[in-house]
From Swiss-Prot:
Its cofactor is pyridoxal 5'-phosphate. [2Fe-2S] cluster binds at residue 328. InterPro entries: Aminotrans_V_dom, Aminotrans_V_PyrdxlP_BS, Cys_deSase_IscS, Cysteine_dSase, PyrdxlP-dep_Trfase, PyrdxlP-dep_Trfase_major, PyrdxlP-dep_Trfase_small. This is Cysteine desulfurase IscS. The keyword rRNA processing does not apply. Its EC number is 2.8.1.7. It comes from Shewanella denitrificans (strain OS217 / ATCC BAA-1090 / DSM 15013).
Length: 404
């Protein structure tokens, strides 16, 4: 068992050794290192072939046509290209966008930028379980609504939105639907032949591939058009210029192929470990799970331990690599905006920890985690005057705190 135990797979995943091995064959002089756009010699042809294979592997993962895959530097770029690209290309059709308050910062900040450019954005409230009711999306739709952007799996609480129904609704109204699948691609089945989604953002490093690479699925039938955000040599059919990073793309492709092959067995094992972890900590008094327990990705568990400060708990859990909130915002001491949107108060949001389990988590890891969590909570609550008051039956909401 390696300490600290890594339970932060929603932040990033280690590169699968099979992926790393494949990548190494596309870097050095004795490998396939050429520029895929070099059409005049063998080095370029070999690199182009490697990229074509990777494109097909990513397409196969979501049952798409290989021509619908645009390679990017990651999900953040894919999201920017999707949302800004649609908004700018179709601006004469309308300037209204619908999203939710619990989206990733990449979506929220892109929408904020468009607001500065004169677009109007509706940010939907989720239910207390993290799910967005379909009727709420429909009620927000207007004649000038151009785009709906809703994530498939939430990065903090792991809830799965009903993207099948959202896609049907958007298609029936002639509105473009973008889905952020950074947390679901390679972990949950996605079939674009069944799903009426127009754009899908995909990340490499969330599915045991390398960091710094991702993809955007852009539907061909009905055809979706985008305005490029990166100008240059006209790579990726003019949608994303820049020399293709062969080794990165080979890694992304291999990760996608492995994910497709191992998804069922991976998830069965991960679900067993997740259930074991939850069963090991749920007996702790004043412990709550955040987000819907049924409509949830099996590798994610967001738990609030009331009367324990999240940051002190993380320090106490030094043997566990976990986070409070997403990795992108965990450096700030603000409570998670996702948990606040679910209606949690500051104290409960601050006392939450995200545990995310993955391909390389073991039974032994979970046993150790349960032991460490239980001991740490007992120890921290022993030092907490609020816990003492709560145990004495004092209603803390009624206490008038004096300011000094």
């Amino acid at each position: 068992m390696k300490l600290p135990i890594y339970l932060d797979y929603a932040a990033t995943t280690p590169v699968d050794p099979r992926v790393a091995e494949k990548m190494m064959q596309h870097m050095t002089m004795d490998g396939v290192f050429g520029n895929p756009a070099s059409r005049s010699h063998k080095y370029g042809w070999q690199a182009e072939e490697a990229v074509d294979i990777a494109r097909n592997q990513v397409a196969d993962l979501i049952n798409a046509d290989h021509r619908e895959i645009v390679f990017t530097s990651g999900a953040t770029e894919s999201i920017n290209l999707a949302i800004k690209g649609i908004a700018h290309f179709y601006h004469k059709k309308g300037k209204h966008i619908i999203t939710s308050k619990t989206e990733h910062k990449a979506v929220l900040d892109t929408c904020r930028q468009l607001e500065r450019e004169g677009y109007e954005v509706t940010y939907l409230e989720p239910e207390a379980n993290g799910l967005i009711p379909l009727a709420r999306i429909e009620d927000a739709m207007r004649d000038d609504t151009l785009l709906v952007s809703i994530m498939h799996v939430n990065n903090e609480i792991g809830v799965i939105q009903d993207v099948m129904a959202i896609g049907e609704l958007c298609r029936s109204k002639g509105i473009i639907f973008h889905m952020d699948a950074a947390q679901s691609a390679g972990k949950l089945p996605i079939d674009v032949q069944q799903l009426k989604v127009d754009l899908i953002s995909i990340s490499g490093h969330k599915m045991y591939g390398p960091k710094g690479v991702g993809a955007l699925y852009v539907r061909r039938k009905p055809r979706i058009r985008l305005e490029s955000q990166m100008h240059g040599g006209g790579h990726e059919r003019g949608m994303r210029s820049g020399t293709l990073a062969t080794h990165q793309l080979v890694g992304l492709g291999e990760a996608a192929a492995i994910a497709k092959q191992d998804m069922e067995s991976d998830n069965a094992r991960i679900r067993t470990l997740r259930d074991k972890l939850w069963n090991g900590v749920k007996h702790i008094e004043e412990t709550y799970i955040n987000g819907d327990m049924e409509q949830r990705f099996c590798g994610s568990l967001n738990v609030s331990f009331n009367f324990v400060e999240g940051e002190s708990l993380m320090m106490a859990l030094k043997d566990l690599a976990v986070s409070s909130g997403s990795a992108c915002t965990s450096a700030s001491l603000e409570p998670s905006y996702v948990l606040r949107a679910l209606g949690l108060n500051d104290e409960m949001a601050h006392s939450s920890i995200r545990f995310s389990i993955g391909r390389f988590t073991t039974d032994e890891d979970i046993d150790h985690a349960i032991k460490v969590i239980t001991q740490s909570i007992d120890k921290l609550r022993e030092m907490s005057p609020l816990w003492e008051m709560f145990k004495d039956g004092i209603d803390l909401d009624q206490v008038q705190w004096a300011h000094h």
